[in-house]
């Protein structure tokens, strides 16, 4: 069921993922390219109540949708435990758009972020 959030993540269209991921960002020295690694531990998308194939991760906010198809499952003792998704940006405008989503997602979920120095 879809919650009424400003920003959300979906693996199945119309179904919000309630598990909040750990997100790690890396950028090139000139800042024009980089990636965001999303790590979900025991996400609902891997539970027995979900049906269908995961074909990507949708990041949805008031501006629209950002889609990545780079999604993989990690198994522990034969059980799907982790879901990892990678969003790659290749321009500063893509990065700026991603950061607007990330800030909106953080506010929707009561989160903050920290930077490594």
Curated annotation (Swiss-Prot):
Membrane-traversing stretches: none
Xref: Pfam families: Psb28
Protein name: Photosystem II reaction center Psb28 protein
Organism of provenance: Prochlorococcus marinus (strain MIT 9312)
Subcellular localization: Cellular thylakoid membrane
Subunit structure, as described in the record: Part of the photosystem II complex.
Biological processes, Gene Ontology terms: photosynthesis
Sorted UniProt keywords: Membrane, Photosynthesis, Photosystem II, Thylakoid
Main location: membrane
Membrane topology: Peripheral membrane protein
